[in-house]
Amino acid sequence: MRDKKRLTARSGFLATIVLFIALQTGCASIRGQQYHHFSTPTPIEENQTLILGFLGGRENWNESSRGVRQLAMKIDSMNLPDVHIETLENRKRDLAMELILNSFDSNQDGYLDERERGSARLIMFGHSLGGAAVVKVSNNLNNLNIPVLLTVQIDSVGFTYDDHVIPPNVKRAANLFQLDGWLLVGEDEIFAQDPNKTRIIANVKFDYTEKEIDMSGVPWKRRLLSVPHSKMDADPEVWSTVEKLILSEIGDTKLGILAEERVVDPGPDPRG
């Protein structure tokens, strides 16, 4: 019933959504992102972590004004040992799969064996359509028995896709969202398909009814249809939260994860 209501509510906006996406296309190249744009050498070493960030809308993978790209560049500038980070266009999920498989295929035989799958260290995050792409790629990886350490969805918009259901290959998942937009709002809650295997570490709501966000760097076409959705992409607090989640996962526990009052207690951690 919940999914039916969700689909019915959103289906009426399809024409407007098409316009929204068209407006965001801007000067994006026709071909878009290609594999040679990645800088990560493959395969990566067994103890190394691969982080993938998916941009929203029709933005290019290297659009420096978007929060996903800005955070990726910030983490990359930290020169963290054993960490590789890339950003992707949300529609380039096949490209993401190719990079993931090449990264963890240590013997480069075109197949991830049990040892290679077990040692894979993958983190994914994404905003808007990029948040939904994170779940879609996670499901594809689940079909191959490839684990994901952490997924973070930021105002995830899947339209007809069930991006609120997290597959069991994901160990930990977090969701940041707003409900103030008239057209584009994120998933208000994500759920583990198997709570015994996936821990939902946060469902965090951001309120933009009165919160002031500097939108001077946001093009008018992105503000036209959903100001709160665009505000979330430009909100430093949002990306500080995502950064802490990611750095905590790769071992920088000094930063913590989230303010205690914002964490949803999902029960025992599958890590034991």
Protein language model features and the residues they cover:
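N-terminal secretory signal peptides that target proteins for export/translocation
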Residues: 1-9
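Serine-dependent carboxylesterase/thioesterase catalytic core
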Residues: 82-83, 100-191
